[in-house]
């Protein structure tokens, strides 16, 4: 009899891929006899390679080797050689839909995600808005496996189980807040809490203004002068901002500039007292290691279903405005033109 082997497809983005982890973990533990292979972009490997003995990872470079229809056909030939018995499309975009179509034509057991687009459109409508909570992405992913014949009870605590990541594996410079001043590795000191801040996101509608975030940092340091604040994220434009904060405040370290990728970030995040983030991938990374997250929401809204795993709605900082939410992903221009949903959140609220 053929070994049960599920292919799980989710290519991007980082936060959405991270949200598959609690579901894939729960599936793997509840069906230990079933092999599970996650197909994603190379960045996602750290999420899955040590998740469970029956979970494997397969990377696909969709901008290189598997670009275009020719590339997808080559990828499909590689996939069918793996002898999958079920296909779970957790993405349902053009590329995954093409692969899904090929599997369907070859009579595979295939299911894909229901994104509840109608409900989300009503959530962000400019008129007749209906502020109705949509199913979470976690539930949407679990529903796909149920369609395939694998109902899942979501049961996940942390990528490190009941423990935390090993700090000794991290570069020592991340624990050097200023020249000659090493941070104590005692993350349980109530007087010197470890606090993470991920101040940026992919779109302007999800970013708390820099001057206000700097005031938040100042107030945290005022309340906890011995605290250690680790900054996460930042692309080419954002890194200089975080470097400037680290230069200005001795308690602040630009952690992402010193760590080596997602694996290191997850280890450090597991030791934080709290993470402050936008509606961004870092909210989901911290959630995967059982760290409480205070999240700031502007153009987007937790009701769209993208709240971090097991995060409390009470820790979502947001304003009640008739125009909110105006976007599911935060990528639409502000209809008011002033991003008041972010600018009017005071540092004291945070």
Where are the language model's segments positioned?
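Catalytic machinery of carbohydrate-active enzymes
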Residues: 1-350
């Amino acid at each position: 009899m053929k070994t049960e082997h599920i292919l799980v497809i989710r290519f991007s983005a980082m936060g959405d891929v991270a949200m598959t982890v609690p579901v894939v973990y729960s599936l793997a533990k509840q069906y230990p006899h079933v092999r599970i292979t996650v197909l994603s972009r190379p960045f996602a490997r750290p999420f899955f390679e040590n998740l469970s003995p029956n979970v494997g990872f397969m990377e696909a470079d969709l901008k290189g080797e598997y670009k275009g229809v020719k590339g997808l056909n080559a990828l499909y030939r590689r996939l069918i050689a793996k002898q999958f018995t079920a296909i779970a499309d957790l993405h349902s975009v053009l590329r995954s839909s093409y692969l899904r179509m090929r599997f369907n034509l070859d009579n595979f057991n295939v299911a894909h995600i229901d994104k509840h687009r109608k409900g989300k459109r009503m959530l962000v409508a400019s008129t007749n808005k209906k502020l109705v909570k949509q199913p979470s992405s976690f539930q949407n992913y679990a529903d796909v496996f149920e369609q395939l014949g694998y109902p899942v009870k979501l049961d996940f605590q942390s990528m490190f189980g009941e423990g935390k990541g090993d700090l000794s594996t991290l570069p020592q410079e991340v624990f050097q807040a200023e020249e000659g001043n090493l941070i104590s590795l005692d993350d349980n000191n109530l007087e010197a809490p470890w606090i993470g801040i991920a101040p940026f996101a992919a779109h302007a509608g999800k970013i708390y203004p820099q001057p206000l975030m700097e005031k938040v940092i100042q107030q945290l340091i005022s309340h906890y002068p011995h605290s250690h604040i680790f900054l996460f994220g930042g692309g080419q434009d954002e890194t200089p901002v975080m470097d400037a904060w680290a230069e200005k405040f001795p308690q602040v370290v630009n952690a992402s500039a010193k760590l080596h990728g997602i694996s290191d970030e997850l280890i450090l995040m597991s030791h934080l007292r709290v993470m402050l983030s936008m509606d961004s991938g870092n909210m989901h990374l911290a959630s995967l290691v059982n760290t409480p997250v205070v999240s700031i929401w502007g153009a987007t809204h937790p009701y769209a279903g993208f709240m971090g795993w097991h995060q409390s709605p009470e820790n979502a900082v947001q304003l009640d405005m008739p125009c909110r939410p105006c976007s599911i992903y935060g990528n639409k221009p502000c209809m008011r033109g002033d991003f008041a949903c972010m600018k009017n959140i005071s540092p004291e609220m945070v």
